Amino acid sequence: MAVRVGINGFGRIGRQALKALLDRHTDDIEVVAINDLFDTATNAHLFKYDSNYGVYPGDVEARESSFVVDGREIAVVAERDPGAIPWKKFGAQIVIESTGLFTDATKAKAHLSAGADKVIISAPARNEDITIVLGVNQERFDPARHNVISNASCTTNGLAPVAKVLFDRFGIQRGLLTTVHSYTNSQRLLDVASRDLRDARAAALNIVPSETGAARAVGLVIPELQGRFGGMSLRVPTSTVSIVDFTAVLDREATKDEINAAMREYSKDSMLGILGYTEEPLVSSDLKGDSRSSIFSGLDTLVVGNLVKVLSWYDNEYGYACRLSDITAFVARQLNGKTSANGSILKEIVGDPGMWGKNPRLRDRDSAASTTATATSKE
């Protein structure tokens, strides 16, 4: 029986999360309601037409108090107070909290009071019961104790799998992260007054140094690394796809081949669908729509003794939304008491993304474009 899910906040991540849920988890999950303050027609339009990922190929219909996606009707409400959202009426067992406003679990718990059993926050959180990065620490989830769960940030999901491989195989004494991150809606289109004078500047015209807690957050999912990492962000003029630039001092010397071999091995086994591996000379747009948390670039590994620098790509919107959908399915299976016969519940949920990890709609679109281009070149 599918677990019923509600979404609070239908912005960039909320919309991509719904697409990912519909692409990946219709057997485990039924999305029954969305709470958002914008009108239904606007939300349906923005779901259908996306500047980063193109036009949703299915049917989308806006109604007065719901919208219908591919024949599935989803109720829509508009409540400012999460405690006033009628989750109980809709039977929502899990709520995805993606407004960005209720990242403190003391506030997010209002969803529980409104009838939900579990809340998954699509951001780094405070006072949460547990932070989970799939592929790294999901085995620590206890459905009896953990009711408010953080999916961490897109950058923590991009770094943590890479850090885990390095830590498991070589040990890590300390590390520094720079995430070269696409701009987001929190930034300014043009210069405007702000207390943060860098954040005041036009996002599409500048490289903007900024803070990130992603490196420190790795210690939440790999406790042995608590306090060993620091980091910063460089916001750049691209609309999606970012890259982790991670420098670490290892416990022992390693070679480029050893590090790449370890990443390749994990990407094909315990982190299949989470960690990707490539030695292709890719650029950021090549990774748009990739469903994996982190795609390691073996071409760029640098080593000097026990000092290493590695790069790993991630689609900070769709890739993160896929993990958000996957962790929702993971929690849903726990609520239903489902276990895997061979213990590989994560592999069943995430699946094998294939070489590129593209979602089916984007993969089919790109294949069609490639076929058309080939045919044109022969004419």
Descriptions of predicted regions:
Residues 1-200, 302, 326, 334-338, ...:
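N-terminal Rossmann-like NAD(P) cofactor-binding subdomain of oxidoreductases
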Residues 12, 16, 20, 110, ...:
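Alpha-helical scaffold segments in soluble metabolic enzymes
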Residues 99-100, 154, 210, 251, ...:
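Structured loop/turn residues at secondary-structure junctions
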Residues 157, 253-254, 318-319:
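A generic structural signal for alpha-helix starts
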Residues 36, 106, 117, 156-159, ...:
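Intrinsic structural disorder
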Residues 40, 126, 215, 317-318:
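Alpha-helix N-cap/helix-start and coil->helix boundary motif
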Residues 291-369, 373, 378-379:
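NAD(P)-dependent Rossmann-like dehydrogenase/reductase catalytic/cofactor-binding core
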Residues 4, 23-86, 171-174, 179-308, ...:
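C-terminal substrate-binding/catalytic lobe of Rossmann-fold NAD(P)-dependent oxidoreductases
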